Every structure is written in C-alpha cells, then in structure tokens.
C-alpha cells in the first residue's frame, strides 16, 4: 500500500483515485473547488442540474463504458440520433453524411469528392503519426482543397484559436473527426450518447466509489505546494494542511505546475511553462423554443463573433431547450475581460439571427462560465513538447488534458490515462500517453 495524494478532483483525478484504491493504495484527493468534477461538474441552472461545459459520448469511448460498468451505472448510458450543420451565408445546411455533402450548394463537385474522401479516410485511420508535424490548414488544403478550407474551416479556427489559427496540429483535428465520424447508427445517421442525469451521474458514482473504498476527498482545499526531500516526494501542502505522501499525482493544468512543484528542475519547469492554453467563456441559454433541430451548428459568418452553438437538448432531453455558446480565446484577449451581460446579449443576438422567430421573451435564463485554461494549444510537433508523466522527483506523476494528445479533452481519455498513472504508483513504470486510436 502506497500513501497517495491526488491533486485535482476532475474526471482524471477522481478516476485515478478510484483505480488507485482498487489497487490497494491509501488515497487523499485535494481539490480547490467546492465541488468535484472539474469541467464535468454540474451547477443549478434555473432549477435544472446541468453541466457547466457540455459533454457528449461517442461509440469509440470504450474506457467510459468500462468505467461506468465498474461503477454500476452502465444502465445510465443513452444513445440518440443527432445531426450537425453549417451556417453559411445566412442559411443552415445539414452536414456530416453523404447526402448532405452532395446537396451542399456552396462547393463544386470536385471539392465535394475530395472532402468526402478525406473525411472517410480519416475515420479509417489507426495512426496519426504522419500528421504530427502538419498544420490543420496544410492538411485540409492538401486533401480537400483551398476552397474547402476557406469556406468551412478558416473562420472556425480563427474564432477558436485567434492568432494561433494557422498553428493547430492536423493530428489533433483528425482524431476529433475520427471520434465523431465513427459514432454512427449508419453511414447516413450520426448517433451520439449522453449519460442519464448528465456527467454528474458519473462524478457522483466515482465519489461514492472512492469513499466506499476508504478514500478521502477534500474540497475547497487548494494545493499550494508539492513537497519533496532528497529527490523524493513527501507530501502536498493544501488548504493550510500538510498531506504526507509517498506518491503524488497532479492533474491540474500545466500552467500551474511550476508554482506547485518548485523542486522540479528549471528545465522541467520550462517544459511545462511552454505549453500554451486558451480560455473559454461559455454562455448557456434556457429558451422557450428550439433554435435548430441540430445538436451542433458550425458558424462560418464574418459578421458573427461565435464559431458555433451546441443545442444540448437535441441530445439530452431537458424540459426546455438548452443552448451552449462557447467563446474560446487567449485569456490576454481584450474580450475575455468583457462583462457577462455583454456575452449574454451578443450570443442571444446570434441565436435570433439564426432563428428569427426567437423573441426576447423566449430567453428564460442565461449563465456565463469561464475557464482560463480550457484548451491546450496543440501545435504541429506538439507530442515532442509534452514532458514524461513520471517526473525526475521520485513518486511524482504529472498529467493534465494536454497529455491526451492527439486526443481532445474528454471523460474517456481522462479515465484511460488515470488508469495508467494509478497502475504506475509505487513502480518505475512510465505511463503511456498513447490514445485509444493509437499513434
């Protein structure tokens, strides 16, 4: 039995605690927030328990299904036929299946063929190594053509990554395409999943498992320092207390690592500091009527300041329509400091443009959530920038969402990597970053 402290009670931290306890270790989890779950946590939205940031499940998420089975909540998995679309030149066009592609009037036949072929081949990939040093722009232009990139991709990347738009890894984008593109009922019908009761069902089951196995979760207990002596971890200072430990797993965003683990070498700290992140301001609206019939609407419109909307109620049934409008941007962007009211007004104005039948009275409630480190910036060659999970300080492992690369953030990757780091406790094993689709 190894006395272990896990820093962070998000999906990865809670999963790591669950697996570590199953392996017979003693576990304390320290979390700065007053609630567990991280990005998967719920909040009370005008009487509805809802995720702070939207989540959905794909059929490739095998680790999620295995974890739910272990926790006794596999029966809470639900599947629903969904669709995505594009807003182009003031109109909505269905997207994501062969018929929709053939009917799309904004592309010539050759561009349609090249796009369909590139997307199809991407869903059949088992490795993304050849895309590691290629940008998304280079990859799309080479496969689908410049016209396709300019029409369907340029604006989306610009609004999510801003000045870094031309510096986004093709491997990262391709794995996202594969994950969603293989979650289908048939060639003509996308099918995505949700957990009944939302992600809080899984979070609550993890918390119950941890407590049942004798683990302890300390909320509102921010970690101040990971302490070491003689090159070995000895504990964590958190919330004014010291938690002795023979092993520590840090799951907090990499920008915090240098401050949290000052005993790391300057070279190691520089490696964590070099990983850039962008923030998000996520607006959620509760409405009296639906905006569109689609789950996901990409917006490529120079006159709109949003890259898309997620009509979550078109996946998980809710009493009233629920729409997420995410604004991704670097935290030093001037707009990040704008008021909640301005984001609510702008985003609802966009919804009214998409569906002119929406009146001001149709907005029942709105909520604005912010994260400073929501999305790692995965540039070409990003894999070489990611430090090893096991550090030079014996007993200390460090991983956050960027370690899922080329996979994107998600519960399934959180659980997969959490199992790896938990199995490595008390050993010299270096956990693998290899994602579900291989590298």
Per-region residue spans from a language model:
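N-terminal Rossmann-like FAD-binding beta1-loop-alpha1 element of flavoenzymes
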Residues: 2-29
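Conserved Rossmann-like nucleotide-cofactor binding loop
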Residues: 12, 35, 255
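Glycine-rich FAD pyrophosphate-binding loop
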Residues: 21-45
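Mid-domain catalytic core of redox enzymes
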Residues: 23, 222-358, 369, 383-392, ...
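Dinucleotide-binding Rossmann-like beta1-alpha1 core, especially the glycine-rich loop
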Residues: 46-128
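Active-site/ligand-binding neighborhood in enzyme catalytic cores
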Residues: 107, 115-226, 251
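Short FAD-binding loop at a beta-strand-to-alpha-helix junction that anchors the flavin cofactor
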Residues: 324, 388-407, 413, 417
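Internal hydrophobic alpha-helix adjacent to the cofactor/substrate pocket in enzyme cavities
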Residues: 414-433
